[in-house]
UniProtKB/Swiss-Prot annotation:
Chief localization: membrane
Keyword line: Membrane, Transmembrane, Transmembrane helix
Keyword Transmembrane helix: yes
Annotated localization: Membrane
Membrane topology field: Single-pass membrane protein
GO cellular component assignments: membrane
Protein name: Uncharacterized protein ZK1321.1
Domain of life from the UniProt record: Eukaryota
Organism annotation: Caenorhabditis elegans
Transmembrane residue ranges: 6-24
Length: 162
């Protein structure tokens, strides 16, 4: 009994250590979904290249166009602007888009499985600042009325007459 319990604990400990040190690369999504979600850096019209547009996720599934692995070919399927009946072609991905895609999905195996703990401050705090309250900060704000002053004076005069 003692042997099996220590054996199970050691197996559990080994699994725990290896699972913490081994990070799995994130699963690559459909390239065209990723292009649509990151259109702020992946849209070729933003770089004044109005010659083509990349396929939408729906078009990519329907038309079954493939330019291969985007990390290897650095391209994706698209169409020339203005002509939806034109044949599909492979167009180069914009550099910022390709860099972002490569950072996330090419080196995913080197990522940490959990974030690093926050680091301690490098400087030593020697004095604590006191917050000084002044009379100005203790004042209550004035209430601003939208009623004209003349109307208020007339109401006071009417009350005095009664």
């Amino acid at each position: 009994m003692q042997f099996s319990l220590s054996y199970l604990i050691s197996i559990f400990y080994i699994i725990l250590i290896t699972s913490e040190t081994t990070a799995f690369s994130p699963k690559r999504p459909n390239l065209y979904i990723w292009l649509a979600q990151n259109s702020y850096i992946c849209d070729p019209t933003l770089l004044n290249k109005r010659t083509h547009r990349f396929l939408t996720p729906w078009e990519s599934v329907r038309l079954r166009c493939s330019c291969g692995d985007p990390l290897a070919t650095k391209s994706a399927c698209g169409r020339k602007h203005g002509n939806s009946n034109q044949k599909l072609a492979c167009f180069r991905l914009p550099d910022p888009c390709l860099r972002e895609y490569a950072v996330i999905f090419e080196h995913g195996g080197n990522r940490l499985s959990v974030p690093l703990p926050p680091s301690k401050p490098h400087r030593i705090v020697t004095a604590v600042r006191k917050t000084v309250t002044t009379k100005h900060s203790q004042r209550t704000p004035k209430i601003v009325s939208t009623i004209p002053v003349g109307a208020v004076l007339r109401v006071k005069k009417v009350k005095e007459k009664l």
